Amino acid sequence: MKTTLLFSALLLPLSVAAQTVSSPNGAISVSFSLADGGRPTYEMTYKGRPVVKPSHLGLELAKDKHATKGFAETSLMDGFTESHSEVSSFDETWKPVWGETATIRNHYNELLVSLSQDHTGRQMNIRFRVYDDGMGLRYEFPQQDSLVYFIVKEEHTQFAMTGDHTAWWLPGDYDTQEQETQESRLSEIRARFHDAVN
């Protein structure tokens, strides 16, 4: 009996260990874990050097704006446990109808993490796609009775950068997203934004 309990106790830390996925060329790595209180967290490295420090993930729902009756809880930021994770790869080449290149390669490794918020019964997936030149993530909501229709009030996705990196960004405006791509340091975006949209 003591041996069984000790073995079970040794396995417990493994269930909350970070899940990691790397780009096809291995240069970029993204790690996901649940921080204290079951808060989804990720970080990213490039060639072993930190680029994004541990950053939290989550959403806040608009109060009383969802069809799930009886649930006053609006936070999708903590209280999660990991129910499943899987890593997969994808590689395809496709031909755009219009553009500068004849073919585009869509090649990435993916980490899908399925989370369950125990006190609400809600489920949320976070999908990370890691390419040789960057990373993307998205929130997904499997069909479920405890979250049928909802409005996202706030997105709490953090990008805790490790330095004043070079960024390529699009200046968004209230009436158009069709602006030219800008290149600057992160610290220069706010000052350059007005000139970029005018």
Functional labels for PLM-detected ranges:
Residues 20-198:
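N-terminal accessory beta-strand-rich subdomains and adjacent acidic, glycine-rich linkers
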